[in-house]
């Protein structure tokens, strides 16, 4: 029997709600453009043009000791931004009480331990859902209820024909009883009377201080709403009483909820005593229903009882039933690492609920929509000269003021610290290598100055200011080859290099004018991973190589080694210093003659020898045998400490704020730890060397390079040939890095600037060539580290929920400050000289390992060493045979090995062509692998994307709901796959 209030029809909605302030309603009648009930991310909601529905918090309360000591206890629940309170009212005979709450996942109050349990996935009994449906079908349904207080709301839901005035008064007094929350003191605190309610005062309507200061409030996002579910057994009720209310405007219902939030929903489930936990389980079922995003989306738009029941039926169709005896219902299922997508549930909901539909996308289309450059407006040809450059400028100018204002955040400070140290280390490392490769024509000072000038200019004018310019391994290889060529043909190196730079700038400008950057659409994951793996291996190789070189500078002293002998000579009548000099080195360790005044220094250390008036003699007197081992200790300490601190963010230790701080400043803390350890022991480890004088490394040359010098004029024309190869290298290096940084899964809002970036690099090539400074291009690893240090994640995270990736903090200031500090480092030598070089080498190793471990290529290499039964459940292994996966990985390994061999041999002059050849190899793979396999192993090229329907991929992967695994994982929102530890 449906119970209605007198005059209920006056406020029961006949259409979708109109007064929801969060704007959930769809004003567009077009069913193809409506909001999605999924709402897994704010970004998707913005793409659809509607706000996201609020999160749902659910709280379960229990009444103890009725009627002598009326007291409510919370048992609770919450889901993303709707707060629900569920009060459970047992009868006189019920003395036990349960405490639960849901903040996206269920938490149970451990009464004995006095704490909340770990969040877990709630499980329900199927009969409780069926009984709940029956009770709601026969109960009271009020939509757009105008109640403005708890008293008005209680009067509305209890004004039913089946209740006598006396029972109605008792029930109202019970519902108006102030609940006893977990964080409050015990004792009965009645709200508004005992048997008959009275008008509430302003103080009684105001939320309590405990509600406003509840720590749980910080875990709920702004705009969160509350819903209340009251369920329980009352002996004085003769028949069940059910009511579901949706308030027209959200209202704060006094101290009813644990957290002070405006309430939107109210559900009442009462009835006479029954065996078991019938109403308790029905209350849990109602709370779980309201925490479900699909049900919540439907009930917000429901216009009558039929819509409400249809939403519940849709939920029942999605329920998974576990057979009895095969699963313990009391077992707690831990939260998944990544929440499943709701897209696969759309078809069933669209069949049941009248409302805006969501257009269906095939998984293939969606995969490319989230690809690195699919449908990117920056990569569309305009057909005009410099058309792409003009479009990039027009696109970036409106964002220019915000590029500086968005940097006013503490996170940017930590990013500056780490990227500055990484940039300085890179400048010193590559400056030293460049000095060795060019016999001092360029050195550390030129590296510092060039990094500061080129990097700062690029950050101010580039289309993607998050890019960090630096010397790179491939460009260094080309510089070495160019210097060797100049020396072999007796050419003046810097003037010849100037003409090469002029030609490179010219070729790059031609590429900009002809919009050649649109060719990056052919740079698929195969090319990106090959290049990224090569750069990461260069970082690892250089870090380990530099560390091993320290063992030559500071050799390890082995016991009994004759090369490190040390004797103490005492002046005396028989002492003959000339005899020591004439003694062969191999025989000096055997000389322990008092006639010569010599004593083995192992018995008398050199400082003691000097104090007693002797003279230490021998090559081992001034050798500190611990430097090599201690440098290795600093190297490994900085590496492992940075890795450990980065992993703290996802660990169980410390509060979330502390974990995030340690993770953000992991590299800086690792460097400080290494410096402190070095200062504590006081060993003479090699320190960071910063130039102290502002003058060119090569004596006798000025800051401007003469165009000709001693070279014949025709060499200025011949320089075009090596410049062509270098242009290919610059284009590939710059654009591959740009493609990686501008992938759509990074959720960049300000757009890319492929043409503008290449134009800036061309101008800087001309400037650095004229000043005799190193050439600079986008540094893949450091740029990725820069972006990773600026990751934005949601602050409000429910217990058990991982922070949602929101995007990157896009701005220009961090890079600009980094390069200004790099230039000023020449004047910071008194401070920087205390940083040990092994510590910086450890950070270099850390960056290379983190970048290498974050790409899919590395995971596929691991599969080569795993038996099939121990392999992880990767999505690609469900759709591609394992032998085909191994074949694809083997081809990538062969290409990577070939690139490394060519880079390390005199044939490195063709290294740029080999990078370009990666695109050709990927194109040839279309003859070896099917489009279906390439779709999962790599990405399809533009021609393959257009032919997807023709090749039959769409029917196989179409989103039909039957293949739940594909549908869920294909639409799974993911953060960028880079895990480079930065600050």
From Swiss-Prot:
<dbReference type="InterPro" id="IPR003020">
    <property type="entry name" value="HCO3_transpt_euk"/>
</dbReference>
<keyword id="KW-0406">Ion transport</keyword>
<feature type="transmembrane region" description="Helical">
    <location>
        <begin position="899"/>
        <end position="919"/>
    </location>
</feature>
<dbReference type="Pfam" id="PF00955">
    <property type="entry name" value="HCO3_cotransp"/>
</dbReference>
<feature type="glycosylation site" description="N-linked (GlcNAc...) asparagine">
    <location>
        <position position="576"/>
    </location>
</feature>
<dbReference type="InterPro" id="IPR013769">
    <property type="entry name" value="Band3_cytoplasmic_dom"/>
</dbReference>
<feature type="region of interest" description="Disordered">
    <location>
        <begin position="186"/>
        <end position="205"/>
    </location>
</feature>
<dbReference type="GO" id="GO:0045177">
    <property type="term" value="C:apical part of cell"/>
</dbReference>
<feature type="transmembrane region" description="Helical">
    <location>
        <begin position="665"/>
        <end position="685"/>
    </location>
</feature>
<dbReference type="Pfam" id="PF07565">
    <property type="entry name" value="Band_3_cyto"/>
</dbReference>
<keyword id="KW-0813">Transport</keyword>
<dbReference type="InterPro" id="IPR003024">
    <property type="entry name" value="Na/HCO3_transpt"/>
</dbReference>
<feature type="glycosylation site" description="N-linked (GlcNAc...) asparagine">
    <location>
        <position position="183"/>
    </location>
</feature>
<feature type="transmembrane region" description="Helical">
    <location>
        <begin position="624"/>
        <end position="644"/>
    </location>
</feature>
<feature type="transmembrane region" description="Helical">
    <location>
        <begin position="815"/>
        <end position="835"/>
    </location>
</feature>
<feature type="transmembrane region" description="Helical">
    <location>
        <begin position="712"/>
        <end position="732"/>
    </location>
</feature>
<feature type="transmembrane region" description="Helical">
    <location>
        <begin position="500"/>
        <end position="520"/>
    </location>
</feature>
<keyword id="KW-1003">Cell membrane</keyword>
<dbReference type="GO" id="GO:0140892">
    <property type="term" value="F:sodium,bicarbonate:chloride antiporter activity"/>
</dbReference>
<dbReference type="GO" id="GO:0046541">
    <property type="term" value="P:saliva secretion"/>
</dbReference>
<dbReference type="GO" id="GO:0055085">
    <property type="term" value="P:transmembrane transport"/>
</dbReference>
<dbReference type="GO" id="GO:0035725">
    <property type="term" value="P:sodium ion transmembrane transport"/>
</dbReference>
<feature type="transmembrane region" description="Helical">
    <location>
        <begin position="415"/>
        <end position="435"/>
    </location>
</feature>
<feature type="region of interest" description="Membrane (anion exchange)">
    <location>
        <begin position="415"/>
        <end position="983"/>
    </location>
</feature>
<feature type="transmembrane region" description="Helical">
    <location>
        <begin position="443"/>
        <end position="463"/>
    </location>
</feature>
<feature type="region of interest" description="Disordered">
    <location>
        <begin position="332"/>
        <end position="357"/>
    </location>
</feature>
<comment type="function">
    <text>Electroneutral Cl(-)/HCO3(-) antiporter that favors chloride ion entry and efflux of hydrogencarbonate and sodium ion across the basolateral membrane and may participate in salivary secretion. Also mediates Cl(-)/HCO3(-) exchange activity in the presence of K(+) as well as Cs(+), Li(+), and Rb(+). Does not contribute to Cl(-)/HCO3(-) exchanger in the apical membrane of the upper villous epithelium.</text>
</comment>
<comment type="similarity">
    <text>Belongs to the anion exchanger (TC 2.A.31) family.</text>
</comment>
<dbReference type="GO" id="GO:0005886">
    <property type="term" value="C:plasma membrane"/>
</dbReference>
<feature type="transmembrane region" description="Helical">
    <location>
        <begin position="758"/>
        <end position="778"/>
    </location>
</feature>
<dbReference type="GO" id="GO:0008510">
    <property type="term" value="F:sodium:bicarbonate symporter activity"/>
</dbReference>
<feature type="glycosylation site" description="N-linked (GlcNAc...) asparagine">
    <location>
        <position position="600"/>
    </location>
</feature>
<keyword id="KW-0050">Antiport</keyword>
<keyword id="KW-0039">Anion exchange</keyword>
<feature type="transmembrane region" description="Helical">
    <location>
        <begin position="837"/>
        <end position="857"/>
    </location>
</feature>
<feature type="glycosylation site" description="N-linked (GlcNAc...) asparagine">
    <location>
        <position position="979"/>
    </location>
</feature>
<keyword id="KW-0812">Transmembrane</keyword>
<dbReference type="InterPro" id="IPR011531">
    <property type="entry name" value="HCO3_transpt-like_TM_dom"/>
</dbReference>
<feature type="region of interest" description="Disordered">
    <location>
        <begin position="1"/>
        <end position="48"/>
    </location>
</feature>
<feature type="region of interest" description="Disordered">
    <location>
        <begin position="946"/>
        <end position="983"/>
    </location>
</feature>
<keyword id="KW-1133">Transmembrane helix</keyword>
<feature type="transmembrane region" description="Helical">
    <location>
        <begin position="530"/>
        <end position="550"/>
    </location>
</feature>
